[in-house]
């Protein structure tokens, strides 16, 4: 019986030995509960009855303490398997530290080009970086972050198993749904509509995702000035960073052939707030526009003509939302600084996209082309039909394309005609078979409880023909360039981080935009992504190891941590020796 390790039904280790050791490890290497001060206590038991038998263990199992203890969940087993796979993958790629065998090297793998090409271009097939990727290089430990980037698939799977990550996603989603309920309503309508009409939506996933992002961004930003409550969430933006010098690109170019050395940086802004510039009150319907019988184009023309007046009284604040597991802001300054920089990038991008509408139009097209999309290809007609049925502003706007009329955007109007055609004539068949009336979601007014209205496919029969101007991504890029020009001119120099615990916004940090700080950070991050420098691990102090490494997946295999902790131990011994010798003199 002595020397055996027993596991009770709750997964706790029980050591039936004559001496009870209350330090962090038992003699055979298995972990047991530590005492508060991590001392070792030997409790001699000469009585053989002190050895636990099966009956004793059964009694322990039935103690009240164990009644509230859950057995190990299956997800923990899955998490452990994924972690083992990730560590093996990183070790295989980075290799062992030649100076410290069995521990992972802390320099980039030789024979590979650089993280941007290794991870983004070759592994993920994405010719772009994200704001998050630039900001997370230094927010914690750069070494850990790049280990994770190089094992991205496994790292993401592990993250998705973590409760706090799931909780954070739910909070972001609930805020988006509260501000923009039309998204879920559209998805529900589309699902039912396709089932009833037996239509299919054959559209490439990348095209579908980009189209949804562009459509929603236009709609939400227009709504910010009309019927919205002064808020818009989950808005896409992008900019460029130079591959050679690591500088953010300040001036847009019209041709992708001139920007090959520039890498796209994409981002999604959590929250925009339209407020009065003088009293900081949130502005609802600041443009005072009646949207009935209006179109995107009419509203944008009105906003552009009144931009000077709008700018004199209003501003838009960019916010980033951070979720917390406790109602406290992060105690580590680098984490807060990373969030600030993330918001500064968004501010820079909106400034970049509000310089000139023609250049912004081409910038969005370059973005689409870098994703491998054909900007001249007609968009799936079924997708467009669902937009027409659910969004009157869009439906009224695309009549210009139907009849071959200009949309009052010079770059698009000179660029729109092509050899491709856009034909919705096949939808005439819907009028002779199956249902023709459907309930579609509508924007709710404060004095109305109606969330849907009935529409008839027959009311949209004029669209079911060959259009004179093809509906392509170029149309959406044109409308994006107009609304981003408007919003970019209103963006405030005051930026904000919003901290949420559950659904409670318990703290905000407001801070100024800092061009110099942003430029320095962009260059330093670009250098590591594009191979200009190696990874920078954390400064090797015991405080840092206790703070940064405590929950790191790589803490047991990290050579940087292991080697420097041993140095600190040796240093401690040397200091102790020096003190002892000096005291004896």
From Swiss-Prot:
Its EC number is 3.1.-.-. Residues 1-26 form a transit peptide. GO terms for molecular function: 4 iron, 4 sulfur cluster binding; DNA binding; metal ion binding; single-stranded DNA 5'-3' DNA exonuclease activity. This is Exonuclease V, mitochondrial. The keyword RNA-binding does not apply. PANTHER family: EXONUCLEASE V. Belongs to the EXO5 family. Binds 1 [4Fe-4S] cluster. Keywords: 4Fe-4S, DNA-binding, Exonuclease, Hydrolase, Iron, Iron-sulfur, Magnesium, Metal-binding, Mitochondrion, Nuclease, Transit peptide. [4Fe-4S] cluster binds at residues 141, 549, 552, 558. Single strand DNA specific 5' exonuclease involved in mitochondrial DNA replication and recombination. Releases dinucleotides as main products of catalysis. Has the capacity to slide across 5'double-stranded DNA or 5'RNA sequences and resumes cutting two nucleotides downstream of the double-stranded-to-single-stranded junction or RNA-to-DNA junction, respectively. One of its GO terms (cellular component) is mitochondrion. It comes from Saccharomyces cerevisiae (strain YJM789). Its main location: mitochondrion. Its cofactor is Mg(2+); [4Fe-4S] cluster. One of its GO terms (biological process) is mitochondrial genome maintenance. It is found in: Mitochondrion. Monomer.
């Amino acid at each position: 019986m002595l020397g055996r390790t027993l596991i009770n039904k709750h997964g706790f280790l029980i050591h039936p030995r004559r001496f009870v050791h209350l330090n962090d490890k038992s003699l055979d290497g298995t972990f047991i509960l530590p005492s508060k001060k991590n001392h070792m206590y030997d409790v001699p038991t000469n009585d053989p009855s002190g050895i636990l038998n099966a009956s004793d263990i059964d009694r322990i199992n039935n103690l009240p303490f164990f009644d509230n203890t859950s057995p190990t969940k299956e997800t923990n087993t899955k998490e452990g398997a994924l972690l083992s796979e990730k560590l093996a993958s990183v070790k295989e790629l980075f290799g062992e530290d030649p100076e410290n065998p069995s521990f992972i090297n802390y320099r980039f793998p030789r024979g590979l080009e650089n993280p941007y090409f290794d991870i983004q271009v070759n592994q993920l097939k994405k010719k772009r970086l994200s704001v998050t990727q630039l900001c997370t290089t230094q927010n914690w430990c750069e070494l850990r972050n790049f280990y994770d980037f190089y094992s991205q698939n496994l790292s993401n799977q592990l993250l998705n198993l973590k409760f706090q990550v799931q909780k954070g996603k739910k909070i972001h989603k609930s805020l988006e749904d509260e501000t923009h309920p039309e998204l879920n309503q559209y998805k529900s309508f589309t699902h039912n509509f396709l089932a009833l009409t037996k239509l299919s939506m054959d559209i490439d996933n990348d095209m579908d995702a980009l189209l949804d992002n562009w459509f929603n961004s236009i709609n939400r930003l227009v709504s910010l000035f009309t019927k919205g409550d002064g808020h818009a969430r989950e808005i896409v933006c992008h900019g460029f960073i130079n591959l050679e010098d690591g500088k953010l690109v300040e001036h847009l170019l019209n041709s992708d052939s001139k920007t090959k050395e520039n890498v796209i940086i994409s981002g999604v802004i959590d929250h925009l707030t339209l407020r009065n510039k003088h009293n900081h009150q949130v502005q609802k319907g600041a443009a005072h526009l009646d949207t009935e019988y209006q179109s995107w184009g009419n509203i944008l023309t009105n906003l552009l003509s009144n931009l000077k007046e709008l700018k004199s009284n209003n501003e838009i604040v960019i916010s980033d939302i951070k979720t917390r597991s406790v109602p406290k802001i992060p105690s580590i300054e680098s984490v807060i600084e990373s969030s600030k920089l993330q918001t500064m990038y968004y501010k820079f991008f909106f400034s970049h996209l509000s310089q000139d509408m023609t250049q912004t139009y081409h910038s969005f097209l370059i973005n689409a082309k870098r994703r491998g999309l054909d900007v001249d290809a007609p968009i799936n007609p079924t997708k467009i039909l669902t937009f027409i049925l659910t969004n009157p502003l869009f439906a009224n706007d695309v009549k210009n394309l139907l009849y071959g009329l200009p949309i009052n955007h010079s770059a698009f109007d000179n660029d729109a005609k092509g050899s491709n055609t856009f034909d919705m004539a096949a939808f005439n068949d819907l009028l002779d078979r199956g249902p023709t009336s459907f309930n579609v979601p509508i924007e709710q007014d404060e004095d109305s409880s109606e969330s849907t209205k009935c529409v008839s496919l027959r009311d949209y029969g004029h669209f079911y023909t060959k259009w004179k101007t093809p509906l392509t991504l170029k149309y959406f890029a044109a409308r994006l360039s107009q609304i981003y020009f408007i919003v970019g001119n209103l963006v405030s120099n005051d930026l904000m981080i919003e901290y949420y615990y559950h659904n409670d916004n318990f703290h905000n940090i407001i801070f100024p935009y800092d061009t110099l700080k942003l430029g320095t950070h962009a260059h330093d991050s670009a250098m590591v992504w594009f191979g200009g420098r190696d990874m920078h691990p954390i400064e090797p102090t015991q405080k840092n190891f206790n703070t940064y490494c405590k929950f790191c997946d790589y803490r047991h295999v990290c050579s940087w941590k292991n080697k420097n902790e041993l140095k600190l131990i040796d240093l401690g011994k040397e200091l102790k020796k020096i003190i002892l010798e000096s005291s004896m003199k």
